[in-house]
C-alpha cells in the first residue's frame, strides 16, 4: 500500500528543518573560530527556501484532504497541529539564521526535538483511536465514507420524520377548518330555525286573536236572533 503523501512530505520537511538547524549550528561554530562561511550561508538560504515550499505543499495537501473528506476532522486537527509546529520552527530557524554569530537556545531545542522524533515518522499515531488502529489509508477513508453515509442516512430519516409531522399538522389544521365550517353551518341553522319559530309564534298569536274575534261575533249574532225571535213571538 502506498504511503500517505502528506506524511511522506511531512517527514522530508522535518529532515530539511533538521538539516537547517545543524547547518546554522555549524556556521555559528565556524564564525566563532574566525572562519568565513559564505558556502554554508548559501546552503542555509537554499534549504530555507525548500522548507517554505514544503510547508506550503503540506498546507495545500491538508486543505484538499479536509475539503474532500479524505480524513476525519480529528485527524485534520492533528495534522494542522504538526503543521503549526513546522511553521513555528521555520520562523525560529529563520530568526536564528539572521542572527549571525550567535547560537540561541532555539537551535538546540530544535535539534533536541528532531532527535526525539527520529524513529517516529508519524508522531501523532501514538494517539490513534482504536477505530482506525492498524488500518491503511484507503481503509480509513472507506471507514470515513461509511460514517458520512450513515450520517447522511440519519439526516434523511430525520428529514422524513419532520416532513411527516408537518403533513400531520396540515391534516389536523384541515380537519379543524372543516369542524369550524360545520359549527358555522349549525349556528346558521339554529339562527334560521329560531327565526322560523318566532315567525310561527306571531302567526299563532294572530290566528288566536282572529279566533277570539270570530267567537264574539257569533255570540252577538245569536243574541240578535234571540231578540228578534222574542219580539215576533205571539203573546196571549
From Swiss-Prot:
One of its GO terms (molecular function) is syntaxin binding. Residues 42-65 form a coiled coil. One of its GO terms (biological process) is regulation of protein localization to plasma membrane. Residues 1-215 are cytoplasmic. Residues 233-236 are vesicular. The keyword ATP-binding does not apply. Residues 145-207 form the t-SNARE coiled-coil homology domain. Ubiquitinated by HECTD3. Keywords: Coiled coil, Membrane, Phosphoprotein, Transmembrane, Transmembrane helix, Transport, Ubl conjugation. It is found in: Membrane. The keyword Membrane applies. It holds the Pfam family SNARE. Its main location: membrane. GO terms for cellular component: early endosome; late endosome; membrane; perinuclear region of cytoplasm; phagocytic vesicle; recycling endosome; trans-Golgi network. It is a single-pass type IV membrane protein. The modification Phosphoserine is found at residue 160. Vesicle trafficking protein that functions in the early secretory pathway, possibly by mediating retrograde transport from cis-Golgi membranes to the ER. Forms a SNARE complex with STX7, VTI1B and VAMP8 which functions in the homotypic fusion of late endosomes. Part of the SNARE core complex containing STX7, VAMP8 and VTI1B. Interacts with VAMP8. Interacts with HECTD3. Interacts with TPC1. Belongs to the syntaxin family. This is Syntaxin-8. It comes from Mus musculus. The gene is Stx8.
